Amino acid sequence: MQKSLHIDPNKCTHCLQCEMACSFENYGVFNNSKSRIKVFEFHHTGRKVPYTCTQCDEAWCMHACPVEAIKLDKNTGAKVVLEDVCVGCKVCTVACPFGTINYVADIGKVQKCDLCFGEPACAEACPTGAITFIDANWTGLDRMRQWAEKTDTAAA
């Protein structure tokens, strides 16, 4: 069963626990600038929305990487950056339409959400349940795929 992050912006309080948990899980420090998930605030509405890599089926970042440093983790479905292969060219950051791949100057490599190899720290840390790690079927992923197939067939 494939799982995915489900984000409910209505439950987000902008506490940044997700960012802190992510940076600690990946770097051993509480530093939101090192987080692979970000909480964006829409200033005109005051709404806060956590966002991170959506682990696209057709991952442009993976296809754009000239050294094939982004690979599919078949256990989690996550697209994972292989740090020992990444050359820091940033082509994947340009290819990602959502802006969820970030260049880390300290290490000269890119980073993106890897779902913490199946146990996302952000979901564990979220006190309000705004971020949950659930069966992908519950996120509507299958319905979106069915709709896409239907529209592709209609266009053909």
Question: Language-model segments: what does each one mean?
Answer:
Residues 2, 31-67, 72, 83-156:
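Flanking helices and flexible, charged tails adjoining ferredoxin-like Fe-S electron-transfer domains
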Residues 1-7:
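N-terminal beta-strand motif that seeds the catalytic metal site of vicinal oxygen chelate
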Residues 10-30, 35-42:
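A positional/architectural concept
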